[in-house]
Amino acid sequence: MKRRPRKWKKKGRMRWKWIKKRIRRLKRQRRKERGLI
């Protein structure tokens, strides 16, 4: 494994948080669709 710079670690964490937010939004949209059907 190659050593990663500290800057990359911070960016990785931000990206992970952003991905989690997207997943939550998708789940909320699906719940709304189920309620309408």
Curated annotation (Swiss-Prot):
Q: Which ranges form a coiled coil? A: none
Gene (name only): rpl41e
Q: Name one GO cellular component term.
A: ribonucleoprotein complex
Other facts noted in the record for this chain: Initially thought to be part of the large ribosomal subunit. Crystal structures show eS32/eL41 to be a small ribosomal subunit forming a bridge at the interface of the 2 subunits.
Give the similarity note.
Belongs to the eukaryotic ribosomal protein eS32 family.
Residues crossing the lipid bilayer are none
Its function, per the record, reads:
Interacts with N(4)-acetylcytidine (ac(4)C) 1459 of the small rRNA; the acetyl group of ac(4)C1459 briges the interaction with this protein.
Binding partners and assembly: Part of the small ribosomal subunit.
The UniProt keyword set, sorted, is:
Ribonucleoprotein, Ribosomal protein
Q: What is this protein called?
A: Small ribosomal subunit protein eS32
The domain of life for this entry's organism is Archaea
- Organism annotation: Thermococcus kodakarensis (strain ATCC BAA-918 / JCM 12380 / KOD1) (Pyrococcus kodakaraensis (strain KOD1))
